[in-house]
Amino acid sequence: MIRRLPILEGRLQPALILCLILLAVPAAGRPAEVHAPDVKVRLVTDEADMALAILNERAERGEASPQSWERLWKSEGFVRLKKRQEAFGAKDVEKDFRDFLGSAKPLAQRDALRQALELWKHLGVPAAAQRAAAYLPPGIPLRATIYPVIKKSVNSFVFELDTNPAMFVHVDPQKSSDSLENTLVHELHHVGLAGCPKPPDFDRMSAAQKKAFDDLGAFGEGLAVLAAAGGPDVHPHATDTPEAWLVWERDVAGFSVDLRRLEAFFRDILAGRLPAEEENRQLISFIDAEGVPQGPFYTVGWKMAAMVERARGREGLVKTVCDPRTLLAAYNEVAADHPRRAGEGLALWSPDFLAALAPPHPRGG
């Protein structure tokens, strides 16, 4: 399942006796954890548990008790979600949740939401974390708390990647467990990638080179697609609909054209020809195909990474993930030997473009 670049951002059972809710809900919200040398991922469902409890109380009694609302406000998931929303300028977050959970739509969906949340609770979080970590360099930590949340907006996003990484994932009744796990791997890989150090030459880069380097990080979408699939020989949409499969095949077929379009975009950044607003508009256009989170950063990034892994193994690919410039160079070397078809090989990154991404070597020793 393909997910959107996280940097672009871009609430259960009533009781005839209230104390039964109090006893049941905390157990449901207990976090599941997975630990490994560089992996610590928690799944915390308390916000969704409390939201479902409110919906169930509404169904049983017509309204939820003040105590139930207070438990929602104090849940770890809601506290962090509110902090994130307020960081983006939201006002009256609690009122918005009251209005949403008091409306007809979530009440009508409560059985479907309960089933969707149960899928999350039985999801293979340890396996998903290890699949994401398999495409990260040794020593890069993968730390995250995953919050399946019931909320009005259907988007999912990350927060506080530099300090206490959180993933907020919309509880979607339409998702299968396989699709959810692929989404989880994809987003966890983004979280891990955010822990990469800057390259040694970053401080010597010009402002334009730093912009280009940061935007090259969007190829992390393709890397995350590969990690979620589990390898270069597994179709990225193996768990999706035939329609999604066909759209992916259509877009991958435009690889060479899209590579040249991306190079032109980065050349404009390096030359200082793009105002910030236009740069962002074009960047988004490369990760959003007709409203679908897919585009050249996904397809070109995936194909480059898949070819490098096939030719050099996963270890060879993983060496490139923290510096996307090395991925482009590795792809060029692999693609130069790729079999030709119809008299034309795969498009390559221009040598002068790759050279322009690096700052001059320092003088002297």
Annotate each PLM feature.
Residues M1-G10:
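N-terminal secretory signal peptides that target proteins for export/translocation
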Residues G10-A15, P31:
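A cross-taxon signal for low-complexity, glycine/charged-rich
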Residues Q13-V25:
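Bacterial N-terminal signal peptides
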Residues R30-S103, L346-S350:
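N-terminal mature-domain "stem" immediately C-terminal to a signal peptide or N-terminal signal-anchor/transmembrane
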Residues A51-G62, S75-E76, Y135, V191, ...:
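Structured segments of extracytoplasmic/periplasmic soluble domains
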Residues E70-V79, I146-V154, W245, R325:
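Acidic helix-start/capping segments at beta-turn-to-alpha-helix junctions
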Residues R98-W248:
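Acidic/His-rich structured neighborhood in mature extracellular/periplasmic domains
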Residues V247-G365:
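Pan-zinc metallopeptidase signature
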